[in-house]
Every structure is written in structure tokens, then in C-alpha cells.
Amino acid sequence: MACSSLTQRPADAVVGASDPRVQDVGVGIFEKGGNAADAMVAMMMTSGVVTPSRSGLGGGGICQILDPNEGRVKTLNFLYRRNNGMGMPALAKGAFSLQKYGKLRWQDTLDDSIRLARQDVVVSEQLAKDILNAKGLPLEWKKLKKGDKVSRKDLAATLLKISEKGSGVFYNGEVSEGLSKQGFSAEDLKSYRATFMDSMDVSTAAGRAYFPNPSAISTLGYNLWNALENPEKEQEALQTVLSLREKNIAMEEASYGESFFAADKDGLIVVCSVSNGGLFGNKKLMKEGFFAANPFSREKSETFFFNILQTNPDVTDAMAVVAGVGSHAWPDALSLMRDDEEALEISDQRKEELDNFISLKCAKGYPNQSMSCRENQNIVFVYTGK
């Protein structure tokens, strides 16, 4: 299990991501006066610049949003679906939809991703490993090693268009015209929508636990949580995990992805998981600078994503958050969330090399208006990856 730092500044603002460059972008958004939604948009778009193996404009994902003013948790579903042998690019639509919760101008949330894409991006250790493990990459990518630099200027041009004209240019404008010439259905691009809905929830000793809706992998977690609440169903829960692992053995590559977390001083909390459906998606680099996603069906793509958001009874404060990509991370996730023997026994069945998630725990809730979770020393942040 590899650990990553959690960045907390300014006061009562927290961001989490596996790449320090992505974390820095999230922090920068808070320093500009943005909130958790603004930071999340910026981090998701930046991740596609620096870690295109696991995220990007070609992919999609799931978010959960806790707005204390509403007293409920919403799911933002922007999963990609099959489209002419490629996955429908969904990230831009998801990020633009999330901006409804933001405070900054849309352009301000994309400035850093554009700036980084205009530069030659340094290949991180994680990206170098992904390049080594990926088969069928374009030669100019396959030869890259840690510390090398790669041009993302084509992506920068695409991001600039999205920044200036909104996500509409990507799905029904200049960018979509180019995508339709490379195999995407112009009609499907035009009709694609990200959707908001109420998250699934279950009662807990501390309050409630929320799961994205409708995600197949989250339905599994929902059922596992319920089973673990009943000691008589402990073995049933364990067998469920083992059965899922056996069933998904051929889909392990699709477990690669990224997760992000952001919380602000006003109590808005956003947690997201994204993926290309495999390392570098289907390995096709579009002229617009991003890799197309793997062409999994919507039903299969739903099994790649999960996150849990545990709240107080009034649904105004988060006690714990965990997010990740891939069914193999569920055992560790449940173990971190619950800290009990049943969850730990399930955790013993994990495959560590496939786990990939982030976690935040605040025993007294986060954020407390007068004191942050970190100041209370009730925080656990974990990133596990390949």
C-alpha cells in the first residue's frame, strides 16, 4: 500500500489526489476563492494532462456531492458508453455539470490544466509504470520513461476551446466535428448527457452511508455494508467479495483509474472517481490530444467505479469518505470505513496490487467550522495504487 500526502491549505480546505501536481492545482483554486466543486473540476481536468493513462477527456466517471444546505447527497453520473468501438468521451460533460455547485467562472477552473498542457509534461513514476504495462501504445508514447517530457499541446488547444465556449463545443461544435471524422457518432455526441440523482443510502451507527446511484459496484458495496451490519451474514459478505473477484478476473485492466476528494470551509464535499476503462483506454490517441476510452458497455463500466460518503444523521457533515476504481479495492475500503473485525476479514482477501483508492476519516466530522479535521488529528488519508 503506497501512501500519498493530503494537502490542506488554506484553513479548512482539503484536496486529495495521487499526483502532487493535481493536488497543487486544487489548492490553487481555493486560493483563488473557489470552493470544493471548482477544485474538483480543476483536478479532474488536470489529471488527464499529467496522467492520461488513467483519466482524461476520453473517459468518464462518478461523483458524490454533499451540500450541507440541501441536507442530502447527490450522485453525478457521467459514465462513458459504447460508441462505434470506442467509449463515449464523458469527462467534459461531467466536469461542466459539476460546475453548477462552483463559485468561480468556468474558464478559471481550466486555466491550470491548459497551462500545464502547453508545457512539456514530465513523465511521473506512475505514468512510466503504466506505459510499461500498456500494450499497443503509439510508438512516441511507448518509448517514454520516467523523467522524460511529452508534448500535450494538442490537448491544450482542445482544453482552451472548452474553456472559452463550454462543454457544448466538445459535443456539438468545433471539437465534435473533428471527433466525428475519427469514428464517433455525431448524433450520439450531441445527445450525451450527464445526470444528477439522489445517492443510495443506508443507516449506520454514526448516521448514514451514501453510495452512487446507479452504479453496479456501489450496489455491491451497499449490500456488503448491510450484510456486515448483521454478524450472521459475515460469511455471506465474504463469499460475495470472492465471487465478484472471480467473475471480474478478465476485467482487471479496467480497474485502472483515479480518484479525487475536495472539501471546503462551507461544508461542500465532493468525491469523484474517473477512468478510461483501462490503461490509456483503447490506446487510440485522438487528434484532439486525448486517448479514447475502452468500448465497454454502460453496464460493465458501472462496475469500475465506487465511492462511499458517510455522514452524520442530519446529512450536514461528513465523517468518512472513500473513493476508488475497481472492485478489488472494495475490501480495503470497507475495512477503513468500518474498523471492525468483519471488514478486516474481508480486507484480508484483497489483491493489493490492484487496489486504487483514497480515504478520509474524521471522527468528529469535517469540516467543523471552528476547527479542521487535521487539527483534531482524526484524519486518515490513503492512496493505494499499482
Regions from the PLM with identified roles:
Residues 1-4, 386:
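Polar low-complexity intrinsically disordered regions
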Residues 3-141, 156-157, 163, 172, ...:
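Proteins synthesized as precursors that undergo proteolytic processing into mature forms
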Residues 14, 30-32, 51, 133-214:
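Accessory "access/gating" subregions that flank catalytic or transport cores
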Residues 67, 77, 152, 312, ...:
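Acidic/polar residues at beta-strand termini and the immediately following turn/coil
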Residues 194, 200, 353-386:
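Cofactor-centric catalytic regions
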Residues 210, 320, 380-381:
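Ordered hydrophobic segments in well-structured contexts
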